């Protein structure tokens, strides 16, 4: 416990900056506000002479908690989805592969990124997982920036851009946020503790095979198994999720310190181009499903769009689009 206390003592400045950044991000309706707000403000502060750091001793437990949180989006409907909608599932896989290959090729040829960096930077989703993976794989700040900044730009670009497309095609709708409503009884806390324990065991197993980002991957696999089969229903409350995202955003923002503003602008510019390419590919695949299989174009387009899962689901609810059927 003393080690964790000392780690918090070394990291508290970054965490406080992250909380402020997350709060400011909510005021301007930034997507993934507590993550991106904490990341961006820590990044800005890192350009100054004010020294901030985030201890890895805290970072690893945060990854495990976030893995359990992400696994909470799984449910038994995932099993039915592949069985009932095989064509859209295949199209989703192909769309992801095509988008990743095209954008990775762009990053390698135009931006001169390394191949493994280009692949991570090109993936059309899972910003949290990708950001934690690159932080765990390399200590090179420039390579981290080459992945995290284009990925953050993708989330911002796509999530801010998508609602305008829906307004022009369907009309204005109010998009309300929503969260998990839990009953905080003994069973709830036992299930949460159980998920953390089995995720810790899974982490130890993956670490033996030297798999990167073991805490978050183990938690998603192990906890995801129990969530998918609905053997457990307890999920972390929204406030706990926001705290975890502040910690993650602060950790990532600190680790990008040392990048020149010119490099950040360069990575952001190409992140916007990446987003446009991925949206174009998503539109093509959605159009194919509409023409040949009769799928609703806007629903299919939204499911293929390279935005965050939470934001896409919120938009689907606002526009009464059932993503489970595509």
Question: What do the predicted segments below correspond to?
Answer:
Residues 11-13, 17, 74-105, 192, ...:
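Entry/N-cap segments of selected transmembrane alpha helices
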Residues 76-84, 169-186, 230-236, 262:
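Membrane-interface helix termini and inter-helical loops of multi-pass transporters
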Residues 205-289:
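Transmembrane helical segments that form the transport core of multi-pass membrane transport proteins
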Residues 104-160:
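Membrane-interface helix-loop-helix junctions at boundaries between adjacent transmembrane segments
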Residues 39-84, 222-229, 238-264:
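Hydrophobic transmembrane alpha-helices of secondary-active transporters
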């Amino acid at each position: 416990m003393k080690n964790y206390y000392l780690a918090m003592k070394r990291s508290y400045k970054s965490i406080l900056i992250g909380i402020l950044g997350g709060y400011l991000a909510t005021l301007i309706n930034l997507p993934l506000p507590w993550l991106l707000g904490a990341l961006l403000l820590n990044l800005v502060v890192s350009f100054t002479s004010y020294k901030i750091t985030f201890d890895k001793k805290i970072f690893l437990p945060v990854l495990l908690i976030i893995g359990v949180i992400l696994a909470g989006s799984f449910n038994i409907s995932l099993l039915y989805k592949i069985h009932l909608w095989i064509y859209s599932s295949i199209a989703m896989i192909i769309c992801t592969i095509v988008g990743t290959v095209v954008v990775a090729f762009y990053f390698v040829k135009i931006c001169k990124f390394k191949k493994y960096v280009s692949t991570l930077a090109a993936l059309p989703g899972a910003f949290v997982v990708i950001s934690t993976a690159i932080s765990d794989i390399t200590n090179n700040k420039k390579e981290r920036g080459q992945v995290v900044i284009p990925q953050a730009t993708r989330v911002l670009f796509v999530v801010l851009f998508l609602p305008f497309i829906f307004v022009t095609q369907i009309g204005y709708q109010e998009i309300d946020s929503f969260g998990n409503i839990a009953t905080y009884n003994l069973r709830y806390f036992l299930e949460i503790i159980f998920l953390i324990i089995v995720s810790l065991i899974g982490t130890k197993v993956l670490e033996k095979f030297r798999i990167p980002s073991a805490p978050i991957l183990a938690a998603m696999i192990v906890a995801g198994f129990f969530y998918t089969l609905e053997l457990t229903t307890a999920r972390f409350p929204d406030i706990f999720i926001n705290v975890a995202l502040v910690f993650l955003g602060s950790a990532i923002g600190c680790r990008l310190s040392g990048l020149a503003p010119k490099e950040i602008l360069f990575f952001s510019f190409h992140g916007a181009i990446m987003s446009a390419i991925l949206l174009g590919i998503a539109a093509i695949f959605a159009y194919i499903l509409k023409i040949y299989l009769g799928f609703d174009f806007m629903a299919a387009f939204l499911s293929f769009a390279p935005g965050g899962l939470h934001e896409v689901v919120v938009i689907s609810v606002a526009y009464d689009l059932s993503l489970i059927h595509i």
